[in-house]
């Protein structure tokens, strides 16, 4: 009924939020690693 429909919507939006947050975290990690690699390549310390 109405309750299960509401629950599904809530779960879906919760999952999307988790995925977005996880994606952001992973993206930031990748960015930091990329910056570190570029930095050491510029300095020639790789």
From Swiss-Prot:
Transmembrane segments: none annotated. Keywords: Amphibian defense peptide, Antibiotic, Antimicrobial, Disulfide bond, Inflammatory response, Mast cell degranulation, Secreted. Disulfide bonds join 40-46. One of its GO terms (cellular component) is extracellular region. Expressed by the skin glands. GO terms for biological process: defense response to Gram-negative bacterium; defense response to Gram-positive bacterium; histamine secretion by mast cell; positive regulation of mast cell degranulation. It is found in: Secreted. The keyword NADP does not apply. Its main location: secreted. Mast cell degranulating peptide. Causes histamine release from rat peritoneal mast cells in vitro. Has antibacterial activity against the Gram-negative bacterium E.coli K12 and Gram-positive bacterium M.luteus NCT C2665. Belongs to the frog skin active peptide (FSAP) family. Esculentin subfamily. This is Esculentin-1SEa.
